[in-house]
Amino acid sequence: MSLFARRTLLSSACAFAFAALWGTAAAAAEPIKIGLVTALSGQSALSGEAISRGLQLAIDEVNAKGGLLGGRPLELVRRDDEANPAKGVVAARELIYKEKVAVLFGGLDTPVSMAIVPLVNQEKVPFMGPWAAGTPITKNGANPNYAFRVSAVDETVDRAMLQYAQKTFKSAKPGMILVNNPWGESNEKGLKSALAEKGIAAAGVEKFEAGDLDMVPQLTRLKAAGADSLFLVANVGPSAQVVKSLDRMGWKVPVVSHWGPAGGRFTELAGPNAKDVHFVQTYSFFGKQSPVGERVIKSLVAKYPAIKGPGDITPAVGVANAYDGMHLAALAIAQAGSTDGDAVRQGFYKIASYDGLIKSYKTPFTAANHDALGADDYVWAQFVDNRILPVGLTTN
Protein backbone atom coordinates (compact mmCIF):
# COMPACT_ATOMS: atom_id res chain seq x y z
CA MET A 1 0.00 0.00 0.00
CA SER A 2 1.37 3.39 -0.95
CA LEU A 3 2.13 6.10 1.61
CA PHE A 4 -0.70 8.18 0.17
CA ALA A 5 -3.15 5.29 0.52
CA ARG A 6 -2.08 4.64 4.11
CA ARG A 7 -2.49 8.33 4.97
CA THR A 8 -5.91 8.39 3.31
CA LEU A 9 -7.02 5.28 5.21
CA LEU A 10 -5.71 6.67 8.51
CA SER A 11 -7.41 10.00 7.87
CA SER A 12 -10.70 8.27 7.11
CA ALA A 13 -10.45 6.12 10.23
CA CYS A 14 -9.76 9.17 12.40
CA ALA A 15 -12.65 11.02 10.84
CA PHE A 16 -14.97 8.07 11.45
CA ALA A 17 -13.83 7.75 15.05
CA PHE A 18 -14.29 11.49 15.63
CA ALA A 19 -17.76 11.39 14.11
CA ALA A 20 -18.71 8.45 16.29
CA LEU A 21 -17.42 10.17 19.42
CA TRP A 22 -19.09 13.44 18.47
CA GLY A 23 -22.37 11.63 17.84
CA THR A 24 -22.18 9.91 21.21
CA ALA A 25 -21.43 13.19 22.98
CA ALA A 26 -24.23 14.97 21.15
CA ALA A 27 -26.69 12.26 22.09
CA ALA A 28 -25.52 12.37 25.71
CA ALA A 29 -26.00 16.14 25.80
CA GLU A 30 -29.42 16.12 24.14
CA PRO A 31 -31.78 17.90 26.54
CA ILE A 32 -34.62 16.07 28.23
CA LYS A 33 -37.55 18.39 27.71
CA ILE A 34 -40.02 19.07 30.52
CA GLY A 35 -43.28 20.61 29.36
CA LEU A 36 -45.47 23.08 31.23
CA VAL A 37 -49.00 24.13 30.25
CA THR A 38 -50.31 26.79 32.62
CA ALA A 39 -51.77 30.27 32.86
CA LEU A 40 -49.00 32.73 32.02
CA SER A 41 -51.33 35.66 31.34
CA GLY A 42 -54.54 37.05 32.84
CA GLN A 43 -55.76 37.10 36.44
CA SER A 44 -54.00 33.83 37.33
CA ALA A 45 -50.64 34.62 35.71
CA LEU A 46 -48.92 34.71 39.10
CA SER A 47 -49.73 31.03 39.54
CA GLY A 48 -48.00 30.13 36.29
CA GLU A 49 -44.97 32.19 37.17
CA ALA A 50 -44.74 30.53 40.59
CA ILE A 51 -44.92 27.07 39.03
CA SER A 52 -42.29 28.07 36.48
CA ARG A 53 -39.93 29.26 39.21
CA GLY A 54 -40.33 26.09 41.24
CA LEU A 55 -39.69 23.92 38.19
CA GLN A 56 -36.70 25.94 37.01
CA LEU A 57 -35.10 25.92 40.45
CA ALA A 58 -35.36 22.13 40.65
CA ILE A 59 -34.12 21.79 37.06
CA ASP A 60 -31.11 23.97 37.87
CA GLU A 61 -30.30 21.73 40.82
CA VAL A 62 -30.56 18.54 38.75
CA ASN A 63 -28.45 20.01 35.96
CA ALA A 64 -25.82 21.26 38.42
CA LYS A 65 -25.34 17.65 39.49
CA GLY A 66 -24.78 16.48 35.92
CA GLY A 67 -28.31 16.07 34.61
CA LEU A 68 -29.90 12.68 33.99
CA LEU A 69 -29.30 9.56 31.92
CA GLY A 70 -25.59 10.02 31.47
CA GLY A 71 -25.33 13.79 31.44
CA ARG A 72 -28.43 14.97 29.62
CA PRO A 73 -29.64 18.35 30.95
CA LEU A 74 -33.27 19.09 31.70
CA GLU A 75 -34.91 21.88 29.71
CA LEU A 76 -38.21 23.60 30.54
CA VAL A 77 -40.58 24.36 27.65
CA ARG A 78 -43.61 26.50 28.61
CA ARG A 79 -46.92 27.28 26.93
CA ASP A 80 -49.72 29.63 28.05
CA ASP A 81 -53.15 27.99 28.33
CA GLU A 82 -54.85 31.32 29.18
CA ALA A 83 -56.96 29.33 31.69
CA ASN A 84 -58.82 27.87 28.69
CA PRO A 85 -59.25 24.06 28.37
CA ALA A 86 -59.29 24.07 24.56
CA LYS A 87 -56.12 26.16 24.39
CA GLY A 88 -54.55 23.95 27.02
CA VAL A 89 -55.12 20.85 24.91
CA VAL A 90 -53.66 22.56 21.83
CA ALA A 91 -50.58 23.52 23.85
CA ALA A 92 -50.26 20.02 25.30
CA ARG A 93 -50.45 18.46 21.85
CA GLU A 94 -47.64 20.72 20.63
CA LEU A 95 -45.43 19.85 23.58
CA ILE A 96 -46.11 16.13 23.20
CA TYR A 97 -45.89 15.77 19.42
CA LYS A 98 -43.43 18.51 18.45
CA GLU A 99 -41.26 19.09 21.52
CA LYS A 100 -41.31 15.42 22.59
CA VAL A 101 -41.48 16.26 26.30
CA ALA A 102 -40.65 13.46 28.72
CA VAL A 103 -43.03 14.74 31.41
CA LEU A 104 -45.81 17.30 31.09
CA PHE A 105 -46.70 19.59 34.00
CA GLY A 106 -50.09 21.26 34.36
CA GLY A 107 -51.19 24.48 36.02
CA LEU A 108 -53.77 26.06 38.27
CA ASP A 109 -57.02 25.28 36.49
CA THR A 110 -58.76 21.95 37.06
CA PRO A 111 -60.85 22.17 33.84
CA VAL A 112 -57.65 22.57 31.80
CA SER A 113 -55.91 19.65 33.48
CA MET A 114 -58.98 17.45 33.14
CA ALA A 115 -59.04 18.23 29.42
CA ILE A 116 -55.36 17.31 29.05
CA VAL A 117 -55.38 14.06 31.05
CA PRO A 118 -57.16 11.93 28.39
CA LEU A 119 -54.50 13.03 25.89
CA VAL A 120 -51.54 12.09 28.11
CA ASN A 121 -53.11 8.72 28.90
CA GLN A 122 -53.65 8.11 25.20
CA GLU A 123 -50.11 9.13 24.24
CA LYS A 124 -48.44 7.54 27.27
CA VAL A 125 -46.78 10.73 28.48
CA PRO A 126 -46.52 11.14 32.28
CA PHE A 127 -48.40 14.17 33.61
CA MET A 128 -47.58 15.91 36.88
CA GLY A 129 -50.09 18.23 38.51
CA PRO A 130 -48.46 20.86 40.75
CA TRP A 131 -51.65 22.81 41.49
CA ALA A 132 -55.07 21.86 40.04
CA ALA A 133 -56.83 19.89 42.77
CA GLY A 134 -59.78 18.26 41.00
CA THR A 135 -60.13 14.72 42.32
CA PRO A 136 -60.75 13.17 38.85
CA ILE A 137 -57.40 14.42 37.52
CA THR A 138 -55.57 11.51 39.12
CA LYS A 139 -58.61 9.31 39.77
CA ASN A 140 -59.55 9.28 36.10
CA GLY A 141 -60.37 5.61 35.56
CA ALA A 142 -57.57 5.00 33.06
CA ASN A 143 -55.49 1.83 33.23
CA PRO A 144 -52.63 2.46 32.95
CA ASN A 145 -52.92 5.92 34.46
CA TYR A 146 -50.25 8.48 33.55
CA ALA A 147 -51.49 11.34 35.78
CA PHE A 148 -49.61 12.07 39.01
CA ARG A 149 -49.86 14.99 41.41
CA VAL A 150 -48.00 16.89 44.13
CA SER A 151 -50.81 19.13 45.29
CA ALA A 152 -53.98 19.26 47.30
CA VAL A 153 -56.86 16.95 46.32
CA ASP A 154 -60.43 18.21 46.38
CA GLU A 155 -62.00 15.34 48.29
CA THR A 156 -59.35 15.68 51.00
CA VAL A 157 -59.50 19.48 51.03
CA ASP A 158 -63.29 19.36 51.37
CA ARG A 159 -63.11 17.32 54.56
CA ALA A 160 -60.42 19.69 55.84
CA MET A 161 -62.59 22.73 55.02
CA LEU A 162 -65.46 21.34 57.08
CA GLN A 163 -63.19 20.44 59.97
CA TYR A 164 -61.63 23.92 59.92
CA ALA A 165 -65.02 25.69 59.78
CA GLN A 166 -66.29 23.67 62.73
CA LYS A 167 -63.16 24.12 64.83
CA THR A 168 -62.39 27.76 64.03
CA PHE A 169 -65.85 29.27 63.55
CA LYS A 170 -68.11 26.74 65.35
CA SER A 171 -70.03 26.38 62.11
CA ALA A 172 -73.11 24.16 62.22
CA LYS A 173 -74.86 25.16 58.99
CA PRO A 174 -72.40 26.01 56.21
CA GLY A 175 -73.44 27.15 52.77
CA MET A 176 -71.63 26.53 49.49
CA ILE A 177 -70.81 29.18 46.90
CA LEU A 178 -69.11 27.43 43.97
CA VAL A 179 -67.90 28.21 40.47
CA ASN A 180 -69.98 26.42 37.85
CA ASN A 181 -67.33 24.27 36.19
CA PRO A 182 -65.73 20.83 36.71
CA TRP A 183 -63.70 22.10 39.66
CA GLY A 184 -66.83 23.38 41.36
CA GLU A 185 -68.58 20.08 40.63
CA SER A 186 -65.67 18.12 42.10
CA ASN A 187 -65.87 20.10 45.33
CA GLU A 188 -69.66 20.03 45.50
CA LYS A 189 -69.45 16.25 45.50
CA GLY A 190 -66.65 16.23 48.07
CA LEU A 191 -68.28 18.76 50.39
CA LYS A 192 -71.62 16.97 50.33
CA SER A 193 -69.85 13.72 51.16
CA ALA A 194 -67.92 15.36 54.01
CA LEU A 195 -71.11 16.88 55.43
CA ALA A 196 -72.96 13.57 55.15
CA GLU A 197 -70.19 11.82 57.09
CA LYS A 198 -70.78 14.28 59.94
CA GLY A 199 -74.57 14.21 59.68
CA ILE A 200 -74.70 17.91 58.80
CA ALA A 201 -77.09 19.50 56.32
CA ALA A 202 -75.83 22.36 54.16
CA ALA A 203 -77.75 25.62 54.24
CA GLY A 204 -77.69 25.51 50.45
CA VAL A 205 -75.58 25.21 47.33
CA GLU A 206 -75.24 28.22 45.05
CA LYS A 207 -73.24 28.49 41.83
CA PHE A 208 -71.98 31.25 39.57
CA GLU A 209 -70.16 31.56 36.27
CA ALA A 210 -66.46 32.41 36.27
CA GLY A 211 -67.15 35.74 34.58
CA ASP A 212 -69.98 36.88 36.86
CA LEU A 213 -69.52 40.21 38.62
CA ASP A 214 -72.43 40.09 41.08
CA MET A 215 -73.12 37.17 43.42
CA VAL A 216 -75.53 39.07 45.69
CA PRO A 217 -78.60 37.03 44.61
CA GLN A 218 -76.91 33.71 45.42
CA LEU A 219 -75.47 35.00 48.69
CA THR A 220 -78.83 36.48 49.70
CA ARG A 221 -80.43 33.05 49.35
CA LEU A 222 -77.72 31.46 51.49
CA LYS A 223 -78.11 34.14 54.15
CA ALA A 224 -81.89 33.66 54.19
CA ALA A 225 -81.33 29.91 54.61
CA GLY A 226 -79.34 30.54 57.78
CA ALA A 227 -75.79 29.85 56.59
CA ASP A 228 -73.33 30.54 59.42
CA SER A 229 -70.24 30.11 57.22
CA LEU A 230 -69.48 29.87 53.53
CA PHE A 231 -67.45 27.31 51.63
CA LEU A 232 -65.96 29.13 48.63
CA VAL A 233 -64.52 27.38 45.58
CA ALA A 234 -63.31 29.59 42.74
CA ASN A 235 -60.14 31.06 41.33
CA VAL A 236 -58.89 34.61 41.84
CA GLY A 237 -61.34 36.76 39.87
CA PRO A 238 -64.66 35.20 40.89
CA SER A 239 -63.48 34.73 44.49
CA ALA A 240 -62.83 38.47 44.61
CA GLN A 241 -66.33 39.13 43.29
CA VAL A 242 -67.81 37.00 46.08
CA VAL A 243 -65.98 39.13 48.67
CA LYS A 244 -67.13 42.35 47.02
CA SER A 245 -70.71 41.06 46.88
CA LEU A 246 -70.56 40.29 50.60
CA ASP A 247 -69.32 43.84 51.17
CA ARG A 248 -72.28 45.29 49.26
CA MET A 249 -74.64 43.20 51.38
CA GLY A 250 -72.92 44.12 54.62
CA TRP A 251 -72.89 40.43 55.53
CA LYS A 252 -70.05 39.50 57.87
CA VAL A 253 -69.83 35.73 57.60
CA PRO A 254 -66.78 33.45 57.91
CA VAL A 255 -65.46 32.37 54.50
CA VAL A 256 -63.50 29.12 54.32
CA SER A 257 -62.05 28.71 50.86
CA HIS A 258 -60.21 26.31 48.66
CA TRP A 259 -56.93 27.83 47.53
CA GLY A 260 -58.19 29.72 44.49
CA PRO A 261 -57.62 33.19 46.03
CA ALA A 262 -53.89 32.45 46.32
CA GLY A 263 -53.42 32.17 42.57
CA GLY A 264 -53.14 35.84 41.61
CA ARG A 265 -54.11 39.45 42.38
CA PHE A 266 -56.74 38.62 45.00
CA THR A 267 -56.15 41.50 47.41
CA GLU A 268 -56.08 44.00 44.57
CA LEU A 269 -59.34 42.69 43.13
CA ALA A 270 -61.21 41.91 46.36
CA GLY A 271 -60.32 44.96 48.43
CA PRO A 272 -59.56 45.25 52.15
CA ASN A 273 -61.82 42.38 53.21
CA ALA A 274 -59.70 39.90 51.27
CA LYS A 275 -58.00 39.34 54.63
CA ASP A 276 -61.15 37.72 56.02
CA VAL A 277 -60.98 34.74 53.66
CA HIS A 278 -59.18 31.73 55.13
CA PHE A 279 -57.88 29.29 52.53
CA VAL A 280 -55.89 26.09 52.30
CA GLN A 281 -52.24 25.90 51.25
CA THR A 282 -49.65 23.14 51.07
CA TYR A 283 -46.66 25.25 52.08
CA SER A 284 -45.53 28.57 53.51
CA PHE A 285 -42.09 30.15 53.34
CA PHE A 286 -42.87 32.06 56.55
CA GLY A 287 -41.91 30.69 59.93
CA LYS A 288 -39.23 28.13 60.74
CA GLN A 289 -37.88 26.40 57.64
CA SER A 290 -36.25 23.03 57.09
CA PRO A 291 -32.73 22.99 55.61
CA VAL A 292 -34.35 22.42 52.20
CA GLY A 293 -36.62 25.43 52.75
CA GLU A 294 -33.70 27.64 53.74
CA ARG A 295 -31.78 26.54 50.64
CA VAL A 296 -34.73 27.16 48.33
CA ILE A 297 -35.33 30.67 49.72
CA LYS A 298 -31.64 31.50 49.28
CA SER A 299 -31.67 30.20 45.69
CA LEU A 300 -34.84 32.10 44.79
CA VAL A 301 -33.44 35.36 46.19
CA ALA A 302 -30.23 34.83 44.21
CA LYS A 303 -31.97 33.92 40.94
CA TYR A 304 -34.88 36.38 40.86
CA PRO A 305 -34.09 40.05 41.67
CA ALA A 306 -37.73 40.77 42.54
CA ILE A 307 -37.58 38.27 45.41
CA LYS A 308 -36.13 39.80 48.57
CA GLY A 309 -37.60 37.37 51.08
CA PRO A 310 -40.50 35.02 51.90
CA GLY A 311 -43.13 37.70 51.28
CA ASP A 312 -42.12 37.88 47.62
CA ILE A 313 -42.35 34.13 47.02
CA THR A 314 -45.98 34.05 46.03
CA PRO A 315 -48.03 32.02 45.52
CA ALA A 316 -45.89 29.75 47.69
CA VAL A 317 -47.81 26.60 46.80
CA GLY A 318 -46.99 26.99 43.12
CA VAL A 319 -43.28 27.21 43.84
CA ALA A 320 -43.23 24.44 46.46
CA ASN A 321 -45.46 21.92 44.68
CA ALA A 322 -43.64 22.40 41.38
CA TYR A 323 -40.22 22.16 43.03
CA ASP A 324 -41.00 18.85 44.71
CA GLY A 325 -42.92 17.59 41.68
CA MET A 326 -39.95 18.24 39.39
CA HIS A 327 -37.50 16.48 41.67
CA LEU A 328 -39.85 13.49 41.91
CA ALA A 329 -40.20 13.44 38.12
CA ALA A 330 -36.40 13.52 37.80
CA LEU A 331 -36.15 10.56 40.16
CA ALA A 332 -38.75 8.69 38.08
CA ILE A 333 -36.76 9.32 34.88
CA ALA A 334 -33.61 8.12 36.62
CA GLN A 335 -35.42 5.00 37.82
CA ALA A 336 -36.69 4.38 34.29
CA GLY A 337 -33.25 4.69 32.75
CA SER A 338 -34.86 6.33 29.71
CA THR A 339 -37.53 8.84 28.71
CA ASP A 340 -39.93 6.15 27.54
CA GLY A 341 -43.33 7.17 28.88
CA ASP A 342 -44.37 3.83 30.31
CA ALA A 343 -40.96 3.29 31.89
CA VAL A 344 -41.13 6.74 33.53
CA ARG A 345 -44.67 6.02 34.75
CA GLN A 346 -43.42 2.88 36.45
CA GLY A 347 -40.39 4.81 37.66
CA PHE A 348 -42.67 6.93 39.85
CA TYR A 349 -43.71 3.76 41.70
CA LYS A 350 -40.06 2.87 42.36
CA ILE A 351 -39.25 6.06 44.28
CA ALA A 352 -38.58 4.90 47.83
CA SER A 353 -37.95 8.27 49.44
CA TYR A 354 -37.19 11.92 48.72
CA ASP A 355 -36.30 14.64 51.22
CA GLY A 356 -38.37 17.44 49.73
CA LEU A 357 -39.40 21.00 50.44
CA ILE A 358 -42.94 20.26 51.60
CA LYS A 359 -42.02 17.10 53.46
CA SER A 360 -39.90 13.96 53.42
CA TYR A 361 -41.67 11.63 51.02
CA LYS A 362 -41.82 7.89 51.64
CA THR A 363 -43.08 5.85 48.66
CA PRO A 364 -45.01 8.89 47.37
CA PHE A 365 -46.72 6.98 44.56
CA THR A 366 -48.18 3.52 44.13
CA ALA A 367 -50.35 1.98 41.43
CA ALA A 368 -53.37 2.72 43.64
CA ASN A 369 -52.33 6.22 44.76
CA HIS A 370 -51.05 8.91 42.39
CA ASP A 371 -51.29 11.77 44.93
CA ALA A 372 -48.17 12.49 46.97
CA LEU A 373 -49.76 14.88 49.50
CA GLY A 374 -52.45 14.31 52.11
CA ALA A 375 -54.44 16.22 54.71
CA ASP A 376 -51.48 16.33 57.11
CA ASP A 377 -49.62 18.46 54.57
CA TYR A 378 -52.17 21.30 54.49
CA VAL A 379 -51.70 24.76 56.03
CA TRP A 380 -54.48 27.32 56.58
CA ALA A 381 -53.61 30.82 55.45
CA GLN A 382 -54.94 34.33 54.87
CA PHE A 383 -53.75 37.55 53.28
CA VAL A 384 -52.03 39.97 55.68
CA ASP A 385 -50.71 43.17 54.10
CA ASN A 386 -50.77 41.53 50.66
CA ARG A 387 -48.75 38.58 51.92
CA ILE A 388 -50.02 35.03 52.29
CA LEU A 389 -49.37 34.02 55.89
CA PRO A 390 -50.40 31.01 57.96
CA VAL A 391 -53.46 31.97 60.00
CA GLY A 392 -52.32 33.54 63.26
CA LEU A 393 -48.84 34.43 62.01
CA THR A 394 -48.44 38.18 61.51
CA THR A 395 -44.68 38.58 61.27
CA ASN A 396 -41.90 37.04 59.25
Which residues does each PLM region occupy?
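Extracytosolic ligand-binding ectodomains
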Residues: 2-7, 12-14, 27-396
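N-terminal signal peptide c-region/cleavage motif recognized by signal peptidases
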Residues: 22-25
